[in-house]
């Protein structure tokens, strides 16, 4: 039997922070953490339980699915409760044995029985337990959730809770949305203790209904149109206007409608038209509209289909068109991008939600009364934490010249001349095309590049994407000898064809392209724009603008750096996988690949996709290094969180096999760019500011159980900076290699 690698994250190593040579400036920073104080003991009751048939300890997903299915029944008997090991914990005393049955649909329908014995003993959670007892974490999380749910001003959307009384609207000619300021909370186990992390999170909804969205499509009876609507809407989040609930769309049903779909209400079968009138006092205007399907399970685990009427549902999130509306995005930024001092103040307003005295009804307790009942107090943590600024290094351009980040021009390290290239432009943008070529030529001299005049391809005004693509195929189509290195598409008012052109370039025909908007040639600073275009094209042609002057300490390790990122493709229920690997010591030459994975066999395809890429990348490295393989591989894996580590089991085993068979050490690092932490510097006037790039947080607020660190990767001039989190997951690494990893991360972000 093949022994699989155990999925356990690396423990935090011992590091002498003061003696490292990769940072030189120690700072104290604020973190958005809150302190929890218990004014009295919390009593928990322990209940042993067993599940039949037995679920193995390794079957975490089955165990989680079982508890999720049975949770409603457990709450009816035990109130707020949680599972830890083979014990159920509750703040409610139950003195009899209880059995809970449910069905799970795994490989067939399986009935499970959870038998919970009467309470075995009591456990007290005290103030000193908060920072050391894992049970205290789950207990406090339940209490905070209970306190927040007592506030009638709050509406809950998965992990986000928003204040419905602070609803705001933004409307432009193209976009109309409502959004609610809100928060996310999570319990953090840090080096200094356990604290509550609170971060601001806004929830955005389309102002129109899903009915409006569906009816913007023509010919709803067409199978092709229905397929497009399903691809656009499935897996999207939505809320109903008549309740504080949100759901995920599983399907759009075009073969049923509110008039034909029935529901059992008080033992009487009625259609949805009558149900909405009786249950919610809502009159359905269009009785023949399609229905939204949400798949759930009942208390026994049996499939339960919920049907919703699009007239009463609103989509959450922004549509793609919204991000193209400059005025809208500016207005949204004004309301949501808070500079550090304002953000700290807004974060601390979380306390007012816990201490709110408004009640749901006369018989219920307010959030403030619940706080008093539990004897809990939550307040902003005033302590500042240690952080370090990493030493800067030189950037080297052509002629071994030092390049400063602020330099607008410099000699390029590895040049790719613009000699054989095409320029597509629309007839009405002729003057812009000429201006583009002249400014590219002018800008090229400062970089030491050569730019010759392109072959011009003039397209008719308002030509379709298909017209542009068919013309491009004359030069880059299958079986045609390629005489041109790349193409620039200059787009005017028809810039909506951008996605089709990039798809044709990258996925269909495989040629290098650069899309330029004609209006960028009509503004001030055209020369600066063309300088940036030149650098982008040079990079796409495998040129190198400059390199980091790494010390021998780094380059002699002969690392290969690999990045893997997954991203869901809304249309077609697919996931895109992008992979890139460095294949030289200076980390300036690359090998890349991509994959498209279907949802139905996502896990199997993904592990093959990643492992296959690593095998190819190692061979490419050997080609560039006289047959020598890399001594170590650092893999940065984005798209999977620490909490989803079991999902990585098969992927890790594949990578482990590939690397061990080739005697290559590897370091597998999870990357999370959407962290809930905010780190700010604080001055003597109690004003907060964003940190500069290169800030490293490697202790203090990091998880005490795992090896993780945070880096502020870029300069932020608007709003608040968000750090990137790195979990060094696998293999064993020495402290020396730890510093090399941190160093390489920062210099390659």
PLM regions: where:
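N-terminal leader/early-domain signal
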Residues: 1, 252-258, 269, 274-280, ...
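Noncatalytic nucleic-acid binding interfaces
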Residues: 1-357, 361-362
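Long, contiguous domain-sized segments
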Residues: 2-27, 40-41, 48-52, 58, ...
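Alpha-helix boundary/N-cap detector
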Residues: 61, 65, 135, 224, ...
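A residue-level signal for conserved active-site and pocket-lining positions in enzyme catalytic cores
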Residues: 276, 423, 635
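Flexible inter-domain linker/hinge segments
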Residues: 305-415, 524-557
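Domain-scale, conserved, charged regions that form catalytic cores
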Residues: 405-446, 567
């Amino acid at each position: 039997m093949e022994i699989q690698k155990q999925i356990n994250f690396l423990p935090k190593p011992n590091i002498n922070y003061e003696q490292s040579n990769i940072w030189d400036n120690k700072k104290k920073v604020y973190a958005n953490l809150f302190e929890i104080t218990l004014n009295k003991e919390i009593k928990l009751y322990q209940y042993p339980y067993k599940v039949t048939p037995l679920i193995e300890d390794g079957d975490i997903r089955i165990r989680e699915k079982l508890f999720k299915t049975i949770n409603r029944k457990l709450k009816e008997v035990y109130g707020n409760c949680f599972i830890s090991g083979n014990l159920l914990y509750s703040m409610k005393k139950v003195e009899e044995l209880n059995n809970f049955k449910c069905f799970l649909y795994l490989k067939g329908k399986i009935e499970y029985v959870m038998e919970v014995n009467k309470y075995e003993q009591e456990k007290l959670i005290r103030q000193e337990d908060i920072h050391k007892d894992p049970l205290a974490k789950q207990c406090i999380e339940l209490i905070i959730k209970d306190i927040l749910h007592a506030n009638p001003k709050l509406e809950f959307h998965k992990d986000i809770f928003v204040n419905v009384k602070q609803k705001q609207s933004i409307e432009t000619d193209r976009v109309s949305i409502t959004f609610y300021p809100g928060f996310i909370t999570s319990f953090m186990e840090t080096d200094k203790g356990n604290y509550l992390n609170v971060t601001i999170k806004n929830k955005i909804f389309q102002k129109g209904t899903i009915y409006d969205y569906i009816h913007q499509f023509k010919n709803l009876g067409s199978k092709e149109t229905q397929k497009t609507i399903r691809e656009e809407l499935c897996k999207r989040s939505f809320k109903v206007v008549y309740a504080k609930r949100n759901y995920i769309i599983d399907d759009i049903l075009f073969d049923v409608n509110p008039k034909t779909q029935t529901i059992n209400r008080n033992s009487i079968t009625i259609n949805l038209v009558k149900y909405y009138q009786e249950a919610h006092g809502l009159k359905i205007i269009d009785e023949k509209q399609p229905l939204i399907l949400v798949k759930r399970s009942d208390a026994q685990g049996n499939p339960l289909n919920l049907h919703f009427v699009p007239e009463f549902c609103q989509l959450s999130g922004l549509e793609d068109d919204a991000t193209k509306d400059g005025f809208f995005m500016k207005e949204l930024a004004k309301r949501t991008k808070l500079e550090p001092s304002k953000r700290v103040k807004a974060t601390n307003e979380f306390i007012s939600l816990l201490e709110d005295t408004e009640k749901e009804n006369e018989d219920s307790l307010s959030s403030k009364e619940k706080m008093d009942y539990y004897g809990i107090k939550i307040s902003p943590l005033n302590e500042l934490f240690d952080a370090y600024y990493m030493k800067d290094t030189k950037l080297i351009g052509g002629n071994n010249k030092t390049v400063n980040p602020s330099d607008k021009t410099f000699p390029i390290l590895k040049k790719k001349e613009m000699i054989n290239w095409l320029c597509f432009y629309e007839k009405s943008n002729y003057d812009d095309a000429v201006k583009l070529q002249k400014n590219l030529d002018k800008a090229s001299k400062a970089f030491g590049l050569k730019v010759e005049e392109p072959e011009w391809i003039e397209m008719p005004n308002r030509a379709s994407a298909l017209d542009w693509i068919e013309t491009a195929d004359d030069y880059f189509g299958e079986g045609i000898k390629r005489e041109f290195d790349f193409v620039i598409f200059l787009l005017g008012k028809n810039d909506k064809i951008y996605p089709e052109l990039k798809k044709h370039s990258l996925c269909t025909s495989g040629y290098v392209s650069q899309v330029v908007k004609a209006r960028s040639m009509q503004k001030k600073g055209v020369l600066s724009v063309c300088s940036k275009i030149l650098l982008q094209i040079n990079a796409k042609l495998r040129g190198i603008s400059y390199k980091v002057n790494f010390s021998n300490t780094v380059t002699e390790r002969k690392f290969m750096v690999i990045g893997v990122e997954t991203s869901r493709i809304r249309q077609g229920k697919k996931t895109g996988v992008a992979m890139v690997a460095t294949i030289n010591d200076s980390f300036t030459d690359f090998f890349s690949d991509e994959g498209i994975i279907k949802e139905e066999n996502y896990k199997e395809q993904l592990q093959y996709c990643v492992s296959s890429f690593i095998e190819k990348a190692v061979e490419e490295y050997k080609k560039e290094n006289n047959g020598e393989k890399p001594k170590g591989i650092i893999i940065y894996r984005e798209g999977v969180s620490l909490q989803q580590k079991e999902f990585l089991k098969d992927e890790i085993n594949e990578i482990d096999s590939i690397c061990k068979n080739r005697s290559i050490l590897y370091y597998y690092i999870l990357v999370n760019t959407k962290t809930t932490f905010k780190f700010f510097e604080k001055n003597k006037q109690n004003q907060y500011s964003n940190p500069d790039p290169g800030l490293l947080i490697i202790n203090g607020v990091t998880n005490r159980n795992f090896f993780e660190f945070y880096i502020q990767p870029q300069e932020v001039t608007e709003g608040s900076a968000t750090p990137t989190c790195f979990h060094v997951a696998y293999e064993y690494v020495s402290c020396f290699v730890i510093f090399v990893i941190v160093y390489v991360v920062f210099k390659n972000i």
